[in-house]
A protein has these predicted regions:
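Positively charged n-region of N-terminal signal peptides that target proteins for export
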Residues: 1-4
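An exposed, glycine/acidic-rich loop-and-rim segment of catalytic or binding clefts
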Residues: 18-379
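C-terminal motif of bacterial Sec signal peptides marking the signal peptidase cleavage site
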Residues: 14-16
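Sec-dependent N-terminal signal peptides
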Residues: 6-10
């Protein structure tokens, strides 16, 4: 097992970028490994730097979080395009937004009142968000230390054993998660999970992106496309009603590109419920489990683009509506209202409580799998 420090990442960038190396290297304000080194619950925590020669990512095994992600704009200038914190204690003490850069689960998104039933057994998980369960409860999979299984220059594999009854969920759940920076400038996330008891699983990834760079302005001019003809509408508590709502003629129709801010202020009950965009899009796809591109984002000032591909059936789009500038990110800039977006591939929220939604039940003889790919390029 080999850990790659900042100096090695810079060297790799020099090798990969030729004449642009000095500009690229000097532009990267990488986080310091020593600011992320600790022992928590008897496990070592550290910071790992990955690179494919063009993009560079830093990951901590506390919560399996992406701390920074550097990509070039159309002129080759590098920016860190994800929100994060500069020190481990910001994550451990939950100072600010809890889910920055994290995998979320066991069940991503919301469970109505934190209640569900399996084979006649009723379960209650923590109501950690306005009377409902959000992203796995009080600890989830983001407030624990993952074990490092494998590290390479461009990839890291983390594993987690979530015990039976943890946060109220049944079954011993074993999760393997791999982050890879591919030669095609993709950030690929893969999950595999198994259980020894019938349970529910719906994992997702929760990086907050700003293609201008962290703290560099609003995402309302980012241009978004989503391959989806329906959303799952919610009540005022952001719990799905169980229906599908066609996007035709609504602010939720992103089948053709639209600036995020173009219709975000429309007089629509769903936008009011979420304070902006914060809902689940049902993806237009064949039910064959293949990985396909389902969304794209374009930032016109820098030319940065991000495609999202997945094998999942749905995606949550959140437009950073609840940030208020109270807390600063990695570089001292306030994390402000609508200065980031999340695109979270998943199955439908609260699926366990809606018979018509795709199943999130995992049995002992099954393997849960999930692929999400964020691809970066410019135009």
């Amino acid at each position: 097992m080999r850990k790659i420090f900042c100096a090695l990442a810079a060297a790799a960038l020099m090798a990969g970028c030729g004449g642009e190396a000095s500009k690229t290297e000097s532009a990267l304000q990488l986080m310091k490994a020593e600011d992320f080194q600790a022992t928590i619950d008897g496990k070592k925590v550290d910071l790992y730097t990955l690179t494919n020669g063009t993009i560079t990512m830093q990951v901590t095994n506390f919560g399996g979080r992406v701390v920074s992600l550097w990509t070039p704009d159309r002129e080759g200038n590098m920016e860190d395009i994800v929100l994060g914190y500069d020190k481990l204690d910001r994550y451990v003490n939950n100072t600010g937004e809890r889910f920055l850069g994290a995998p979320v689960g066991r069940v991503a998104n919301r469970i109505n009142e934190g209640k569900f039933e399996l084979d006649g057994v009723k379960y209650q998980v923590p109501q950690n968000s306005n009377g409902h369960a959000l992203h796995g409860g009080n600890k989830g999979i983001d407030m624990v230390v993952w074990d490092v299984d494998y590290v390479a220059d461009n990839a890291i594999t983390l594993v987690l054993h979530s015990k039976d009854g943890e946060d109220g969920f049944p079954g011993n759940l074993d999760i393997k998660m791999t982050y890879t920076l591919t030669d095609e400038n993709e950030f690929e996330v893969t999950y595999h999970a198994t259980t020894d008891k019938k349970t529910i699983v719906n994992l997702s990834h929760h990086s907050f992106f700003n293609l201008l760079g962290e703290g560099n302005g609003s995402i309302t001019d980012h241009v978004l496309t989503i391959k989806s003809s329906n959303i799952t509408p919610t009540d005022a508590g952001l719990i799905p009603t169980g229906e599908l709502q066609p996007v035709d003629g609504t602010p939720f129709d992103f089948r053709e590109p639209h600036a995020i801010g173009e219709r975000i202020g429309a007089d629509d009950v769903q936008l009011k419920n979420g304070g902006g965009y914060d809902m689940n899009w049902v993806l237009d796809r064949e039910d064959n489990g293949q990985v396909m591109t389902i969304a794209s984002v374009y930032e016109p000032t820098t030319g940065r683009c991000m495609d999202v591909a997945t094998d999942q059936v749905a995606m949550q789009f959140y437009s950073g509506n609840f940030f208020n500038g109270k807390y600063a990110g990695k570089y001292g800039k306030a994390i402000k209202y609508r200065e980031s977006l999340a695109l979270e591939t998943q199955k439908h929220p609260d699926a366990i409580n809606h018979d018509g939604f795709p199943s999130i039940v995992l049995n002992p003889d099954e393997v849960y799998t999930h692929v999400c790919i964020y691809k970066f390029y410019t135009k």
